[in-house]
Amino acid sequence: MATERLTRVHSLKERLDETLTANRNEILALLSRLEAKGKGILQHHQVIAEFEEIPEESRQKLTDGAFGEVLRSTQEAIVLPPWVALAVRPRPGIWEYLRVNVHALVVENLQPAEFLKFKEELVDGSANGNFVLELDFEPFTASFPRPTLNKSIGNGVHFLNRHLSAKLFHDKESLHPLLEFLRLHSYKGKTLMLNDRIQNPDSLQHVLRKAEEYLSTIDPETPYSEFEHRFQEIGLERGWGDTAERVLESIQLLLDLLEAPDPCTLESFLDRIPMVFNVVILSPHGYFAQDDVLGYPDTGGQVVYILDQVRALESEMLSRIKKQGLDIIPRILIITRLLPDAVGTTCGQRLEKVYGTEHCHILRVPFRDEKGIVRKWISRFEVWPYLETYTEDVAHELAKELQSKPDLIVGNYSDGNIVASLLAHKLGVTQCTIAHALEKTKYPESDIYWKKFEEKYHFSCQFTADLFAMNHTDFIITSTFQEIAGSKDKVGQYESHTAFTLPGLYRVVHGIDVFDPKFNIVSPGADQTIYFPYTETSRRLTSFYPEIEELLYSSVENEEHICVLKDRNKPIIFTMARLDRVKNITGLVEWYGKNAKLRELVNLVVVAGDRRKESKDLEEIAEMKKMYGLIETYKLNGQFRWISSQMNRVRNGELYRVICDTKGAFVQPAVYEAFGLTVVEAMATGLPTFATLNGGPAEIIVHGKSGFHIDPYHGDRAADLLVEFFEKVKADPSHWDKISQGGLQRIEEKYTWTIYSQRLLTLTGVYGFWKHVSNLDRLESRRYLEMFYALKYRKLAESVPLAVE
């Protein structure tokens, strides 16, 4: 019987060398085309386009070999004749770099630093000096466990529990950190869980068995207060549960853990420990309020996300605290900027209670400079010089408001995350990072050509802040896998920070590892009290119908709505977003304008921008100008309605349902969308949804079942897909119902705030525990980060001009 032989896996360079030998002329034909493009960067789609141009016979020879594999995995090609360097990504999170001399057909492997140095020559030529600051965070994580399978990306807490639970409980000595962890729990001076009568692991196990024996003999519903003194005498304090049954379950979980540790038992036990009473959520930029702000500059989905988040979080915290047998009142504070001049909003009010909660408040702290309080709104791209002082002011306000340290600090977006990092560092508190959107992926080549963007966007500062925060934080939550590591063909937002360069500033040879167990996918949901299915007629908000009728169909044109819909019997394609370049609303209008068949089948209604006031946002101004041009160019009046941004979320929920009544669809055409909250909202009402395949919506929607993916770079195809859908619905109305039901089912299974809040509190407990009992605190990297902050970030922040009052 023949035996199989194990053979060595050849490197990428070796396989390419073999292909070069076998197909020299064919490869030369392609490389010559790339070289002929001249000095510059070619993206994946451009490389493939050039490959498609070589003769078919040559393409066939290369497609199935190593060279075809390289081409399919190439994310970018750097052309500096006679060299072509390739950044090859065989799978998410794995990168290889090489370059080929087109004239000599010689292949060289490159280290990340060598590739980046080669890339820098596009900007600086070869005279960029011998010494460039290189950032490399890999040495700090080299000894730390990390998964290697793609399915582990975004499941950091599961990996961490598996790896470390066995390590922690392997002998009696290793139990001391757990004992200390249980003993340190207290609230405002009152001891929880264990008191000082329990001094070592042996006495802990003895006491637990004694307690188990006693609890087995009493009524499971017995309140904790009836045996509280008995337990205090043996070393157990409040926090184990509110009834005998619940306390017994907690004690048995810990006994099981001490005897035969496993990750599920560990997570279940940590879930029961009272750890989180005070939560601070940071979101400095924009107009953060509950009423009449959506649609203002820098004010959109993030505000909605946080307000929904805190309602669900408070509910879960209250439930857990009650089950733990405690009478503690939790606090959640949303920290944002106080805007004295934000007339018509509550943004000038220091403290504002969050609707639908008992103990959540918005706490506003102003920006200050040497002259005093900064009164006017400042773009999110220009907040950097204020944030260090702001952090100190926030720390002072928190001490006054909470009378203790928070248990969890959550940062949002770049500015919130760097403030969260500085606060967590100062207070020694568990930190969670939520990016929402990393600007580096939204603006192609904004790293290598950062100087072109600097005056308007100050990306050097923002990318530095992002890098600092993602490496400082204890754990990162993302809404999707794509946010971390992209897809087979597209690079993830965090992944794009693996290796990059800001020529003249610094070179990042290892910025973040997408396999790092700090990454966890925790998807948000839509507020189910607002976004419920259109079929639930008894819940429909009929009182809004006259207002919605006016918005959609009135023949009046004014500051709130322009253009009219002549045929109100047609279905409506609907979209709602901020009016900026990335949201690509004008792109959708252009696709519609160009497609005669689509215009014949449906009307288009856009809710974006605020025409009722003069915008200060440069992108919004440019997009408004473009929109007026499109209306004129394509003669859209009669089939198109442009409505100014609508700030009443409850009415917006009914607006989605009215669009359902027309048998219409929702379209989210963004160039890139980190998550896609409006996608979830639309689907939650039963509205068939077409959304960008770049980012989160690619995961939210299962194409053809719960909605459809569209490519914003191929608007003609997106328009054709819409035509195909509406023609199919015209022939068979049940097709609309099928996609509508598919969307509703998808939301129920995956995207609810209840699931989200449970996961967030679980993660806080687990990472807080591991931070205490292991080296997860990453002290070495934090010292490195302190230096990076002081020597690089601070100077960059100081270079951003202060706002003129």
From Swiss-Prot:
It is an enzyme of class 2 (transferase). InterPro entries: Glyco_trans_1, Sucrose_synth_GT-B1, Sucrose_synthase_pln/cyn, SUS_EPBD, SUS_N. Belongs to the glycosyltransferase 1 family. Plant sucrose synthase subfamily. It catalyses: an NDP-alpha-D-glucose + D-fructose = a ribonucleoside 5'-diphosphate + sucrose + H(+). One of its GO terms (biological process) is sucrose metabolic process. Keywords: Glycosyltransferase, Transferase. Its EC number is 2.4.1.13. Pfam families: Glycos_transf_1, GT-B_Sucrose_synth, SUS_EPBD, SUS_N. The keyword Transferase applies. It comes from the Eukaryota. One of its GO terms (molecular function) is sucrose synthase activity. Sucrose-cleaving enzyme that provides UDP-glucose and fructose for various metabolic pathways. This is Sucrose synthase.
